[in-house]
Amino acid sequence: MVVRRKVHVLLIARSFHSYTPCFRVTTRGKRQRSKSKQQAKVELDHTRELDNDQATETVVDRSVGPEKDIESINKDFLQRTKGLEPDIELKQLPQIKQEFNQRYKDRYVKPSEDWYVNSWRSLTKPKIPLYKLINSDFQLITKLKAPNPMEFQPVQLMESPLNVGDFVLLKMRPNELAMCVSLPSSTMDPRYTFVTIDGTMCFATKNRVLLRIPHKLPAGIHSLIQPESHHKHLPIGTVKNFSNQTNILPIVARQLITSRYPAQISKLAWKDLPITTKKLQLLHRSLQNYMGPWQIPFFTLVGLVQKLDLNKALDDKNGINYLTSLVNNYHTVNDIPINSPTFVSTYWAIMQQQESNLWGEIHLNTALLSPISVTIIPLKSQHLYYAQVIEKLEANSYREVNKFVKLVNERKYRDISALYPSVIQLLKDFAAGNFHNNGIIVALISKIFRKIERYKDCDITRDICQDLINEITPNSIPNPLLLNMDLALPASSKLVKWQQKLYDLTNIEELQWKKSGTDDDRYDFGDLRVFCIDSETAHEIDDGVSVKNYGRDGLYTLYIHIADPTSMFPESTNVDIEGISTDILNVALKRSFTTYLPDTVVPMLPQSICHLSDLGKQGQRTKTISFSVDVKITSKCSGKSIEIMYDSFKIRKGIVSNFPKATYEDVDRILGTPNSEASPVKKDLESLSMISKLLREQRIKNSNAVIFGEGFNKGLVMLNADSEGELTEVTFSDQEETLSTILVSEMMILANTLTGRYFAENKIGGVFRCYKQLPLGEVAQQQYDSMITSTKKGIFPKLKDIVKLSSLLNSSFYTGRPFRHEMIGAKQYLTVTSPLRRFPDLINHLQIHRHLQKKPLCFNQTQIDSLIWPIQSRADILKRASRNSSTYWTLNYLKKLTKLEPERTFDVMVTSVPQNGFTGCVFPDLSFARGTLKLHPSSMHYPMIGDIVKNCKISKIDCLEGMLELEKL
């Protein structure tokens, strides 16, 4: 309807149906003229404005006159009305049809034809006539020779990182699968391009991926996304980096490639969701441990869901026995292919049941971009307990909440502690991050704080929960994150308390007796100097290095001696034992690693075993697993080079006893002090230092190893005791690379690399460490290669370079397969140098013991593969916990600083592509102070990744949530 003063003209211009135009002009007056007079005046009156006191209705009869008269009327009408409404152009139907068809052809048909012909070059692609490309017969898809992604093996996630063709769930769209269609284009924009089922294009970095299903595109597809060609119509594509360039996914690419399987998997996953939810409820009852939370490998849980028969599980007579038998043998499902719809529906069902406090956090691995474990919450102490707490607090119009709030407002904290321990526990769990997707708990806590006078206007955060806890119970733990159930410290779990009790009761005399057993099969290294280089405050000393200089032909023998705690366990010798049978080793597996946090250190093994196995006690004969290899140093005009004599590599059980005192500071001081008559100790250290530098140069030049330079790991958190003895005073230190740190790291890398090669050549199953470089776009790959080239020239990436490259770098992970570690530059990399601190090393030591005795190995390949998931899960949990604790203390420091200096401003470095006026940032001198920067609205140019933005003020801090927001002034 187009309105022009008093004239109303009704037009039908967008229908494809033929019609005869009808124009109606209506005006008001005192009387109506005859029909014949109306028809007579139509040509005079239909565009002329009439007076208010006139009443006229003018009609053109659409049923009279030949077709050419109609066309003449149309033409005359369009000519007369031209320019009445500048924003509206009136057109005839044939012209509308013609222009629509041209737009459709330019926007949709031609891009699809170009893509099909030029971007998909394969003899196996379906032969579809170009005029039938869009909405072609679906049956033709069956001719595509592509892997079926309706099921996959978990090892496929290890074999290849995120790539074009993979299906993902994104944080921004967690309810539908999308396909990765384009790789990061450059360091200035490290975002991937994803396309949803309906063709919507979105951009995100890999840390926004929640779940990944590996999938390879059909052969011959060069690209899926293409720049939208220039045409005279409005563009329909999506802008990524430049406003004058839009990108499109051709319709035929969406119909044939990107939407088919994601749509099928999503549809089946939603269909299966109610059944999967029921299965998970049943499995939870059998899997939960009343003593505390624990993590189950995610793929094991999916396998159980696939295998569980609801009819058998719900049988009144045998259902419980069926479930018990299934769960007790859950480790046997690791070889079952994972059904993709079940994988997705299990993820969705767990997300739903987190609100019922049945499942805890889903732990995501940043290398595989997949869930690898989920925390099972105890039924009685968590699920049922909080159901009762919520019911009690909500009863009688929140009467108990009102009573609690009244006591808080009156500051009667002693009464609160006596009457409301359940509310205090609720607040502690919320502050510790023990609730996930639990809207009921969040709503309840919000209601509590909205009634407390001093908090009612505050944002509801975990920080203010902890503030209230500190008011009620002043002696609360300084860092609430230590109570997180995933961290599993003794303070948060009965199960962990029991495990610690087992450790404390370890029989030292029995271990001493075992340690003093026969050493006939061990090589005694006599007076060979063993340098155990570590810090003064080291909790476990499990490695030492030695060198023998032959004084001719540049020949040296390197020795890496490693503590041998596994010799104390029967698994190292008893061939009747397959896998792990000792209680202590089972607990060590649960811990998997020594926990290092700013606040505390929790050893993986009992202290008694660590003390008995430690190296470094001068004169004490100590058992080792010793690795040795000969190297040859050659002097050339361009400098020295090193050759590793691989055939000389040996693994032996050893005895060492000569331990010269050597901390990092001692070694740096000795190496940095000129002395014309060097002592034997200094000569050894100089030889080791020289060899370690040559080993590093070789890794960089021959194997493309990546070494980070200045600015990496700045602002590491250190805690000091306050006046009351609590570790709450925060200081910061920078991790510096010195001659001593290079010496130790290169010797350990050498031992792990050579042992990985040895395991692979001798087909010994072990736990390898792997790193796979991400596939990148052409420009991004060139920038990465440029960094490698600079590193080979001795120019290591600094903080700005690291920030630019960080999103293009992958993470390392544990695997049972001898894959490459591309970051270190090793064809195989198997860790053996820290058996007191890492369970993977302990497993590999048990394999070495059996291999050296020529006995059957302790673990077969299936057992190794099943151990990978809990180990990797624990590694991810501890890595996240360490980062969260360091962030907590760093933000606490900044929070106190801003209270003292409210107008204090900071300089920050940009870490992400600016979007909607916001960008990620980091404090250059504080690695754990990361947040979001709100850019100034008047900014004409947004900063780029790696740029420094000055004069920024902190606007919000939530230390427990790790949230930091700044504004550019």
UniProtKB/Swiss-Prot annotation:
Residues 522-853 form the RNB domain. It is found in: Mitochondrion matrix. Keywords: Exonuclease, Hydrolase, Mitochondrion, Nuclease, RNA-binding, Transit peptide. It catalyses: Exonucleolytic cleavage in the 3'- to 5'-direction to yield nucleoside 5'-phosphates. Residues 28-38 have a biased composition (Basic residues). One of its GO terms (molecular function) is exoribonuclease II activity. GO terms for biological process: mitochondrial RNA catabolic process; mRNA catabolic process. Its EC number is 3.1.13.1. It is an enzyme of class 3 (hydrolase). Residues 1-41 form a transit peptide. Belongs to the RNR ribonuclease family. Present with 1070 molecules/cell in log phase SD medium. This is Exoribonuclease II, mitochondrial. It comes from Saccharomyces cerevisiae (strain ATCC 204508 / S288c) (Baker's yeast).
